[in-house]
């Protein structure tokens, strides 16, 4: 009688393992699992003087807070000559512009002719 009891136990553990795997798959598909990062390992951001204190946000709220800068970043970076570096900022400037230096092409109207020495009429050589 001991043998059927152990196979029943193994079937039960296999079922529990499969249920756990299925729930993890569903959570990963929904983006709920934090992939090993916990809030206890993260250091709180330093508070600047004059800023109101806020409570620490969960990872879902952090991603929704960064949506407006990211929404502004995509069309801005696709329509300019330069590019932008996203950053975290206390002052609201979440994008740093990096603009290239453009060299002006030399045109005949803007170039000056070479200077040639003119002989002085009072002092002929």
From Swiss-Prot:
It comes from the Eukaryota. One of its GO terms (cellular component) is SOSS complex. InterPro entries: SOSSC (IPR031821). It holds the Pfam family SOSSC. Transmembrane segments: none annotated. Coiled coil: none annotated. GO terms for biological process: DNA repair. Residues 44-73, 105-125 are annotated as: Disordered. Belongs to the SOSS-C family. This is SOSS complex subunit C homolog B. It comes from Drosophila willistoni. The lineage of its organism: Eukaryota, Metazoa, Ecdysozoa, Arthropoda, Hexapoda.
